[in-house]
Structure formats: structure tokens, C-alpha cells
Regions:
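Hydrophobic, aromatic-rich alpha-helical transmembrane segments
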Residues: 125, 177, 192, 196-200, ...
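Cytosolic-side membrane-insertion boundary helix
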Residues: 156-208
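An amphipathic alpha-helical interaction surface
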Residues: 187, 216-219, 253
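Residue-level signal for the membrane-embedded core of alpha-helical transmembrane segments
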Residues: 204, 208, 212, 271-278
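Pore domain of cation channels
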Residues: 230-289
């Protein structure tokens, strides 16, 4: 494969395609109304530069120093950034459709101001930014990006279900709307029970509420036996039985006496196992910080 000829950035005044820009430094450089297609920028420095109405279509930036650059109406559709420094950048009306970031120092707030309007593209960009934040050890930013991603997913799912525009009415019908409803319910339950893994305290609170709920059901509708004798169900006893059932510890001296009580115990035990999985996952996320 022939080696690409290296070019200098200032020499481009209108457009460039399939060009290689490498090992060049242009601080305070100003460029306007230029289109770059499938170009590669390697170790290019543009500190405090001003770029206005530029198009970077499917370009690759590797180890570039773009700190303090002011981007105005710059389109990065399909571009990839690897190990670049984009701290303190300012981005006004920029486009990041299908853009990807890996191991970059970023000004996340500026990029979030330029999220694509299409939900699927916005979610894709947020996933890439979140992976970048995890790679760089920015766990708090990664959690914030996850929350933003889930909010957009829920908004899009609601549109798929209710079809507020002709686009959604044409593309989501019958089974598709039902599947979207199930996805939305799953996200809502995940957020309610444990905040999508971001809020451990909510997990404990919801577990306590479930234990109390099942204790109330045992008190009014369930019956247990001990040594072949029916146990008088008061709330403290029901709360104890609910706790040992939810935590899957069990108690060898007590056993359900009716089919309905058996079903309640089995269902609560399943919920306890599910909650244990949630707890392990949430603690792992917390300790991995």
C-alpha cells in the first residue's frame, strides 16, 4: 500500500480528501469554510485556534492537541478521536453525529450542548462519551452520562408508544409498541428499585418496603405451621418470617400451610435472589471507583 503524502494544514484553503496531516503545530490558527473528507490528523497541535464552518467528514484525530480551540458550526460527522486533548474547548452549534471518542481529555459539557436531535444518534454519542469517561477514570461523569442516556431512551420509548408524530406512527405499530412499552417498564422499575445501579440506598429502601409488604400479606392472608400446629400470625412474627424468606435464609421450624402462602414465599424468595444480584452489582460499581 503506497504511503500517504504528508500535508500542512495551513495550505488547505477550500477542501481536502484522503490527506494525512502529521507532526505539525499551529497555535492560534484560524480557518473558515473548509471541508475535510476521510483525512487523518496525527499529533497535530491547534492550541487556542479558531475554526469556523469547517466540515470533518469521517476523519480520524490521533494524539492531537486541541486544547482551548474555539469551534463554531463545525461538523464532525463520523469522525473518531483517539487520545486527544480537547480540554477548555468551546463548541457552538457543532455536529457530532456518529462521532466516537476514546481515551480523550474532553470538555463534556460543551459536547453535551451539541447532542444530535435524533434520539438514536444522541444515545450512541452518549455511550461513546461514557466509555471514554470510564477509560479516563472519570466515574462521576460516566454516571451523569448514563443518567442522561436513560432519560433520552425513556423519552424516545414514550414517543414510540404514543406516536405523537407521523414518523413514529408509521415506524412503530402493534408489536413494536408493545415491546417499547415493556422496555419502558423495565427502565422505570430499574430506576425505582436501585436508580439503575447508581443509588445503593434506594436499593435498601425498596428492599425494606418489599419485606414490610410481604409481612402484611402474611399477617392477613398467610398461614404457617410449627410442629404441625398453626402459628398465630401477628405483625412481628410475620415481619420475621418475611425477612428470613426474602434473604433466603429460611427457618426450619416454620412452613407454609396453604397453597397461597407457598406461592407468596416462593415469589418473595425469587425477589430476594434478584435483589442480591442487584446489590452485588451496585457494590461492585461503588468499590471499583
Amino acid at each position: 500500500m503506497p504511503k500517504k503524502k504528508q500535508h500542512s494544514l495551513p495550505e488547505v484553503t477550500a477542501s481536502a480528501e484522503n490527506r494525512l496531516f502529521v507532526d505539525s503545530n499551529h497555535p492560534n490558527h484560524t480557518a473558515k469554510d473548509i471541508t475535510f473528507k476521510r483525512c487523518m490528523f496525527v499529533r497535530v497541535g491547534l492550541k487556542n485556534a479558531t475554526l469556523v464552518k469547517l466540515i470533518f467528514h469521517r476523519c480520524v484525530f490521533e494524539d492531537c492537541y486541541l486544547r482551548g480551540v474555539k469551534f463554531q458550526n463545525v461538523d464532525f460527522t463520523g469522525s473518531t478521536f483517539k487520545e486527544c486533548n480537547l480540554e477548555r474547548t468551546r463548541m457552538d452549534s457543532c455536529g457530532f453525529r456518529y462521532a466516537r471518542f476514546s481515551k480523550c481529555l474532553l470538555n463534556y459539557d460543551e459536547i453535551l450542548h451539541s447532542l444530535p436531535t435524533e434520539p438514536n444518534l444522541a444515545i450512541g454519542l452518549l455511550k461513546s462519551l461514557r466509555c471514554n469517561a470510564i477509560e479516563m477514570g472519570n466515574k462521576d461523569i460516566a454516571d451523569r452520562l448514563l443518567s442522561r442516556q436513560i432519560d433520552i431512551e425513556q423519552q424516545d420509548l414514550r414517543k414510540q408508544i404514543w406516536g405523537p408524530t407521523e414518523y413514529y406512527k408509521e415506524h412503530y405499530k402493534g408489536v413494536d409498541r408493545l415491546l417499547s412499552l415493556l422496555k419502558l417498564v423495565r427502565l422505570r422499575i430499574s430506576g425505582l428499585f436501585w436508580g439503575h445501579g447508581l443509588r445503593i440506598m434506594r436499593l435498601f429502601i425498596s428492599a425494606v418496603l418489599l419485606i414490610v409488604l410481604f409481612a402484611s400479606l402474611y399477617q392477613f392472608f398467610g398461614t404457617f405451621t410449627k410442629a404441625n400446629e398453626i402459628v398465630q400470625n401477628n405483625f412481628p412474627m410475620s415481619l420475621y418470617l418475611s425477612t428470613v424468606t426474602f434473604t433466603t435464609l429460611g427457618h426450619p421450624a416454620y412452613s407454609p400451610n396453604t397453597t397461597f402462602t407457598y406461592i407468596l414465599c416462593a415469589f418473595e424468595s425469587i425477589l430476594g435472589v434478584v435483589y442480591l444480584g442487584f446489590l452485588v452489582a451496585a457494590l461492585y460499581r461503588k468499590l471499583s471507583r
